[in-house]
C-alpha cells in the first residue's frame, strides 16, 4: 500500500501534450478488461430506467471511456463531457463520433470556480471514474463535490469510482456535508472504491 500511495503522488502528467496523452491512452487501454466491468457496475447503481432521457455530466471525462459505457447503459442519455485537457477531449470526439448529436464537450478546469457555470445543467446524473484524485488536494476534490451536488436536479445521482488513497471515510463525510441526502460506498478494494450519492428529492 505504501508503494502504491507513493506512486500515485509522484506520477507527473502532461495532459496538455498531444503526444503524452496518446501514449498514456495506449497504456490505459491495456487495463480495459479489468476496468470495464467496474464501470458497468458503477453505472448500474444509478437507479434510472435504461431508456430514460437523462442529462448526464461526465466529470473529468478524459478520452470518453465512462461516457461510452454510459451511452450503452442509458440509450437515450445526453452527455456533457468535461475535461481540462484538449488532447483528451479530441480523443473522446473521435471515440464517440457516432453519438455526436447527443454529446457536448466542455474544456474547463475543475479548480476554476466558474466551471459549474461553464458546464451548464442541471443534470440528472453525474459520473466520474479515476479522475478526481488527479486534483491531488482534498479540499479541491471536496469543492467539486459541492459543485456537483448543486448541478444535480432534485433526486439526481452522483456515482464515482476513484482512488481514495487517504481512505474513503473523509470523502463520505464531505459528500454528506455537501448536501447529499444519501451517501453509500457499495464496493471498495482499497485504495479504489465506488461511491453513490443522491440529492434530496425536495
Where are these regions (language model features)?
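Conserved beta-strand signature within the Rossmann-like core of class I S-adenosyl-L-methionine
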Residues: 155-162
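Class I SAM-dependent methyltransferase SAM/SAH-binding core
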Residues: 55-57, 63-113
Amino acid at each position: 500500500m505504501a508503494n502504491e500511495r507513493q506512486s500515485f503522488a509522484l506520477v507527473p502528467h502532461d495532459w496538455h501534450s498531444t503526444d503524452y496523452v496518446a501514449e498514456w491512452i495506449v497504456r490505459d487501454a491495456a487495463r480495459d478488461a479489468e476496468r470495464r466491468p467496474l464501470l458497468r457496475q458503477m453505472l448500474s447503481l444509478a437507479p434510472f430506467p435504461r431508456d430514460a432521457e437523462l442529462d448526464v455530466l461526465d466529470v473529468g471525462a478524459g478520452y470518453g471511456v465512462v461516457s461510452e459505457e454510459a451511452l450503452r447503459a442509458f440509450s437515450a442519455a445526453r452527455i456533457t463531457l468535461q475535461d481540462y485537457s484538449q488532447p483528451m477531449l479530441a480523443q473522446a470526439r473521435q471515440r464517440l463520433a457516432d453519438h455526436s448529436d447527443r454529446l457536448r464537450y466542455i474544456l474547463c478546469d475543475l479548480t476554476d470556480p466558474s466551471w459549474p457555470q461553464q458546464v451548464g445543467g442541471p443534470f440528472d446524473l453525474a459520473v466520474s471514474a479515476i479522475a478526481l484524485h488527479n486534483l491531488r488536494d482534498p479540499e479541491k476534490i471536496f469543492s467539486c463535490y459541492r459543485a456537483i451536488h448543486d448541478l444535480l436536479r432534485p433526486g439526481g445521482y452522483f456515482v464515482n469510482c476513484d482512488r481514495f488513497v487517504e481512505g474513503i471515510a473523509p470523502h463520505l463525510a464531505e459528500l454528506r456535508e455537501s448536501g447529499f441526502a444519501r451517501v453509500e460506498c457499495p464496493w471498495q478494494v482499497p485504495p479504489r472504491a465506488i461511491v453513490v450519492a443522491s440529492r434530496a428529492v425536495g
